[in-house]
Amino acid sequence: MLEIDNQTPLESDFLSLEKIANVLAPTQTIELVLVSDETMREINRDSRGCDYATDVLSFPLEAIPHTPLGSVVINMPLAQESALKLGHRLEDEIALLFIHGVLHLLGYDHEKDKGEQRQKESELIKTFNLPLSLIERAQD
């Protein structure tokens, strides 16, 4: 299940995100928070000590029965900017960021996992007919 808190005026179709959530975590709730650039900067500064806005952050919760898997926070203005720059829909960019974030909630770590997260993202991109992922774009 997906719980969405859109704190921005930007609108999007979230149906594909429900499908992605059901594939990746069929028995767990995922919270998706859509924020402004400034809010993302504050969250990044407070949680990671990095004083800049980023595109997506993940906050896993402890593995306690009947609690959400965690929260994925997406910077909507940055997602919109990336979608325009890369020539695809905002919904696709949000889906890519969401996949990336949920994989982190599930324990994947592209900085340490020897390509496992990249492989899983690639599989999901094909399944949901999406453009290149964050990791794939970074490596191109």
UniProtKB/Swiss-Prot annotation:
The keyword Transferase does not apply. One of its GO terms (cellular component) is cytoplasm. Zn(2+) binds at residues 100, 104, 110. Its cofactor is Zn(2+). Keywords: Cytoplasm, Endonuclease, Hydrolase, Metal-binding, Nuclease, Ribosome biogenesis, rRNA processing, Zinc. The keyword Membrane does not apply. One of its GO terms (molecular function) is zinc ion binding. Its main location: cytoplasm. Binds 1 zinc ion. Single strand-specific metallo-endoribonuclease involved in late-stage 70S ribosome quality control and in maturation of the 3' terminus of the 16S rRNA. Belongs to the endoribonuclease YbeY family. This is Endoribonuclease YbeY.
